Amino acid sequence: MALIYTNTLLAFTISLLGLLLYRSHLMSSLLCLEGMMLSMFVMVAVMILNTHLTTSSMMPIVLLVFAACEAALGLSLLVMVSNTYGIDHVQNLNLLQC
């Protein structure tokens, strides 16, 4: 079981590092965020299975719902920025302020 924890922690760390280093395009940032959410889902699901907690068995489903909402909002922002400005650079996101 320690190998599963190590792999998911490594996947989360690599996704976080990718989010910090490759933040020029919005699409790469969204992919790194999805990798982080997927590794968090696996970690929470394995932890609940190992500890046999029945009260928090819905936690992975709630995490997936938040990940789906985050992906939908991110993709809609990506479509709006690319339709308006023609590029998906993260530096242009401050132009969306009113």
From Swiss-Prot:
Localization: Mitochondrion inner membrane
A Gene Ontology biological process term: ATP synthesis coupled electron transport
GO cellular component: mitochondrial inner membrane; respiratory chain complex I
UniProt xrefs under InterPro entries: NADH_UbQ_OxRdtase_chain4L/K (IPR001133), NUOK/Mnh_C1-like (IPR039428)
Catalysed reaction equations from the record: a ubiquinone + NADH + 5 H(+)(in) = a ubiquinol + NAD(+) + 4 H(+)(out)
A GO term, aspect molecular function: NADH dehydrogenase (ubiquinone) activity
Protein name from the UniProt record: NADH-ubiquinone oxidoreductase chain 4L
Gene: MT-ND4L
